[in-house]
């Protein structure tokens, strides 16, 4: 996928719907170029075209983690930097399968005696490259998020006790304090980990604020900290 198409995908993910005219103005290209990009993206299963624009094609509600990892990188880096204040030597950590939490790995690598647990295959591979000891929970492989979910994964995390868990979900409503997601399987895993974690930290990029998804994970008061981009620890 070309960089311009990644930009279009980012806008689709943030807005859900885009027009050819708006994309042409935003990206400084012709409408013909935008239409060609949208046609290629539709073939790839990323969007559904309509007259004058396109909508995000539901893929369990979200783009693959391999694509999300490179979206909003500055916000992800900012959140990871701020979240690193909670790290200490000798901790047992859990990282969920979100792309944002993956940005914590360079900070985790600086600490000694860390034991890392995750349901993310991508996190496992990145941790191995950074020489961070890592345990991958078992379960059913969910390709889009490169993670393990389902009853086996739930049984695995139910027996775990961790010092600190890091999460990112699809939505955080600042007014109500509700933290939610569209994916029931991921929400189930996170609920079990949250229950057994001594501390928990949530990280949210700016575009996830003020939203609510179908499945409630918890509320703000259930977390040790909720970090939002360009805001203070809450």
What are these regions (language model features)?
Residues 2-21, 25-26, 32-97, 105-113, ...:
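HTH-adjacent hinge/linker in prokaryotic transcriptional regulators
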Residues 95-96, 118, 228:
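Short beta-strand scaffold positions
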Residues 10, 17-21, 124-234:
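Conserved phosphate- and dinucleotide-binding cores of soluble alpha/beta proteins
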Residues 98-99, 170:
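Active-site metal-binding loops of divalent metal-dependent hydrolases
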Residues 72, 93, 116, 146, ...:
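Glycine- and other small-residue-rich loops at beta-strand/loop junctions that grip anionic moieties
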């Amino acid at each position: 996928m070309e960089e311009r198409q990644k930009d279009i995908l980012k806008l689709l993910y943030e807005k859900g719907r885009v027009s050819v005219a708006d994309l042409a103005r935003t990206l400084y290209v012709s409408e013909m170029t935008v239409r060609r990009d949208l046609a290629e993206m539709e073939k790839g299963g990323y969007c559904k075209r309509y007259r004058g624009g396109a909508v995000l094609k539901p893929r369990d509600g979200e783009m693959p983690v391999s694509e999300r990892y490179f979206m909003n990188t500055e916000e992800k880096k900012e959140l990871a930097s701020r979240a690193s204040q909670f790290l200490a030597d000798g901790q047992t950590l859990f990282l969920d399968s979100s792309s944002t939490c993956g940005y914590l790995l360079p900070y985790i690598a600086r600490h000694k005696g860390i034991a890392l647990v995750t349901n993310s295959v991508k996190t496992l591979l990145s941790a191995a490259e950074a020489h961070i000891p890592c345990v991958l929970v078992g379960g059913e492989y969910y390709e889009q998020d490169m993670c393990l979910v389902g009853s086996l994964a739930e049984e695995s995390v139910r027996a775990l006790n961790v010092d600190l868990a890091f999460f990112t979900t699809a939505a955080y409503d600042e007014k109500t304090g509700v933290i939610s997601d569209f994916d029931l399987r991921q929400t189930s895993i996170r609920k079990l980990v949250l229950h057994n974690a001594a501390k928990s930290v949530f990280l949210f990029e700016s575009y996830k604020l003020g939203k609510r998804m179908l499945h409630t994970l918890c509320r703000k008061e259930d977390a040790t900290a909720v970090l939002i981009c360009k805001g203070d620890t809450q």
